[in-house]
Amino acid sequence: MKKLMGLLLLLPLVGAEPAGYKYWSASDLKALSKTLAPKLNAHKVASDNLGDFGRDHVLVVHREGSGEAELHETEADVIMVISGEGTMLVGGTMPGSKTTTAGEVRGPSIDGGTVRQKMSPGDIMHIQPKTAHQVLLEPGKQITYFTLKVKE
């Protein structure tokens, strides 16, 4: 009986995740990307915040059209492509841009982008804070990616 009670006391420890730990399998992320497609907004983008962890937060983004140009004053983006393909335009200036929320600047496009990086599944990129960037898609294409935003 004592052994049974001891085992029962250990049950809550099995599978318990430490604070701040989270795991997403490749199949979890692919399934999540399918749930985002029906939630597209007027800019043909949908996202789901997967967690806030103090200095960083994680989201999955699904796009079926080119995105706005964006720049984050205090956050770096680490992006991993889950599915689809596109091009990341990086650098340059964002004419006509506006601050949309604290530390977030958006605009219609980038002038003078210095990097045009093709993106496909498994690709990973890091974008420093205060760096203009924009996801570009060819008509009929879509892309889903995992983003880790890290406060600098």
What residue ranges belong to the model's regions?
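A short hydrophobic beta-strand segment most commonly corresponding to one strand
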Residues: G140-E152
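A short, N-terminal "cap"/entry segment at the start of jelly-roll beta-barrel domains
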Residues: L13-E73
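Short, conserved beta-strand element in jelly-roll/cupin
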Residues: E73-T93, T100-S109
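Sec-dependent N-terminal signal peptides
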Residues: L4-L13
